[in-house]
Amino acid sequence: MTGVYQMNNAAVVIETVRVLEQKGYRIDETALRKGLSEVYWPGRFERLHEQPTFLVDGSHNPDGIRALLESLRSYFPDRKIRFLLGILSTKDVSTMLRLIEPLAEEIGVIMPPSEKAMDNERMAQQISRECAVRTTAFASIEEGVRSMIENAEKEDVICATGSLYSIEEIRTCANREFHQNCGGCERL
């Protein structure tokens, strides 16, 4: 389980097992340990590539963004993050931006594939008004992923987040881009 917040999820699993055991269920401790060590949650602090590091995380509300930022600070201390961000218009965009701003080197804006998606140009304008961060609106998820990767240095951290709707397309575009550019170099 990657991401600092996953420790809380593991604690819930362990407590659930404890309660089940009190009710007479027998849970093998080795199986529990194996399960916790092998659990994988796609789209949650999922690392797609190294050098540059490319992460995808489906955080789509202020609490999710707080948890994501805690993990980013833990795994990448003293580093600025290049965010690729697409958020639904029904979300608390201002709070999410305020949380992201201190850690952001740049924000690339995309539109999640949803009727509720916030227009990328409108969101870029909002970011420019509310944050002192370099911002670019991209016409598509593919263009955003390509640009972030092409303009990244090896030591950069790119984090695509803001909507669960975007995860699969971001993953597909990133994997294709890394494969085309370097034959899968440092790909996870």
Please report, for each region that a protein language model flagged, where it lies by residue.
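C-terminal helical cap/extension that packs against the catalytic core
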Residues: 53-54, 62, 97-157
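Short, active-site-adjacent cap segments at secondary-structure transitions
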Residues: 166-168
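Active-site catalytic pocket residues across diverse enzymes, especially alpha/beta-hydrolases
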Residues: 20-21, 72, 127, 152, ...
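Nucleotide phosphate-binding/pyrophosphate-handling subdomain across enzymes
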Residues: 1-106
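Active-site-proximal loop/hinge segments that shape catalytic or ion-binding/gating pockets
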Residues: 163
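Short, flexible loop segments at boundaries between secondary-structure elements
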Residues: 113-116, 179-188
